[in-house]
Design a protein with these regions (language model features):
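The catalytic Tyr-centered alpha-helix of NAD(P)H-dependent dehydrogenases
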Residues: 30, 144-151, 192, 196-199, ...
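Glycosyltransferase donor-binding loop in the core domain
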Residues: 60, 84, 96, 195, ...
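C-terminal substrate-binding subdomain of Rossmann-fold SDR/epimerase-dehydratase oxidoreductases
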Residues: 199-338
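Oxidoreductase cofactor-interface core, primarily capturing Rossmann-like NAD(P)-dependent enzymes
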Residues: 174, 185, 213-216
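A general boundary/transition motif marking the beginning of the first structured unit of a protein
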Residues: 112, 190-195, 293, 312
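N-terminal Rossmann-like NAD(P)+-binding domain of SDR-like oxidoreductases, especially those catalyzing
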Residues: 1-182
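Short, basic/glycine-rich phosphate-binding loops at helix/coil junctions
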Residues: 181-183, 220-221
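Hydrophobic, Gly/Ser/Ala-rich alpha-helical and linker tracts in large acyl-processing enzymes
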Residues: 184-196, 203-206
Length: 338
């Protein structure tokens, strides 16, 4: 299957590309490399022992996207591309809406131009907002608490409207929880630009000596140890979930929503302890005030993923931390200097 992968050089994109290549798909990675590196794609090619094409383009560049789809003629799309940093989002929302929402519209127009009717969208559990109950299932009310989550929700609604125009169109909305981990080889992993926004990459940079200490934002939540609880899912499990979703969309029309998580919550303190064990190093940390709009507990119901896709997460928190440490210790400065 010819699959166009937007954001294919990114953290989740590269791991999914590896799984797709192993499944004999023919991917084309499209990335503007604003928050990623071409080196990541070189490593995917080396690890898979497969050649594949990639091109540099922004989704908001309508002529470029039209040309790419006309040349490649994708049978399906996996859509990862988008800006993410929540703090920057709140400072500069229009740029993020343009990149994420307008970029998706241009992508769909380019797909329509060549009759491509299948798309798997990298959505997010942030669309749920504050829990009305736990675990979150796919029918939980939607009320995102930050602009990033709102863009994901807007795109979900756009994709629903797009799918409604043709019964042969198929959309899979994958709402995933907290991706962590790295490839078992240590060759590809999460390489954030600037200060990491996510917990585990920050811990890894502390462990390798790039940063002095970790700030734990709040230890007074209504949780067993007072720190926030999240559903951490290994990126390699997430990648196999995308391949399962791609297979489903190739056989079915309409719109489906599926959570990708482990169904288990882990606290910040538990993650720190697991990473210290994996790395053999202390993780200096200090308690800081809660961040605005942070949620105490956040974890998935995974029943639909099992029933619809035949998929479930298999790797543990210890696996996640061990693979991240392998990646970070082999690539202390990320891709450019690894």
């Amino acid at each position: 299957m010819r699959v166009l992968v937007t954001g294919g050089a990114g953290y989740i994109g590269t791991h999914t590309m590896l799984e797709m290549l192993a499944a004999d798909s023919t991917p084309l990675a499209v990335d503007n490399f604003a928050n990623s590196s071409p080196v990541a794609l070189e490593r995917v090619a080396r690890l898979s022992n497969r050649k594949f094409d990639h091109t540099e383009a922004s989704l908001t560049d309508a002529p470029a996207m039209r040309q790419i789809t006309e040349d490649f003629k994708p049978e399906a799309v996996i859509h990862f591309a988008g800006l993410k940093a929540v703090g920057e989002f709140e400072q500069n929302p229009l740029t993020y809406y343009e990149e994420n929402v307008s970029g998706t519209i241009q992508l769909l127009k380019a797909m329509d131009a060549v009759g491509c009717k299948k798309i798997v969208f990298s959505s997010s559990a942030t669309v749920y907002g504050e829990p009305q109950y736990l675990p979150y299932d796919e029918v939980h009310p939607l009320s995102p608490v930050n602009p990033y989550g709102r863009t994901k929700l807007f795109i979900e609604e756009i994709l629903r409207d797009w799918a409604a125009t043709d019964p042969q169109k198929s959309v899979m909305l994958l709402r995933y929880f907290n991706p962590v981990g790295a490839h078992a080889s240590g060759e590809i992993g999460e390489d954030p630009c600037g200060t990491p926004n996510n917990l585990v990459p920050f811990i890894a940079q502390v462990a390798v000596g790039r940063r002095d200490r970790l700030k734990v934002f709040g230890d007074d939540y209504d949780t067993p140890d007072g720190t926030g609880i999240r559903d951490y899912i290994h990126v390699s499990d997430l990648a196999t979930g995308h391949v399962a979703a791609l297979n489903y969309t190739s056989r079915h029309g309409g719109v489906e929503v599926v959570n990708l998580g482990t169904g288990r919550g882990q606290s910040v303190r538990e993650v720190i302890a697991a990473f210290a064990k994996a790395s053999g190093r202390d993780i200096p940390h200090e308690i800081a005030p809660r961040r605005r709009a942070d949620i105490a507990s956040f974890y998935a119901s995974t029943e639909k993923a099992k029933l619809l896709l035949g998929w479930q997460a298999r790797l543990s928190l210890d696996d996640m931390c061990r693979y991240v440490w392998r990646w970070q210790s082999q690539n202390p400065e990320g891709y450019e200097y690894g």
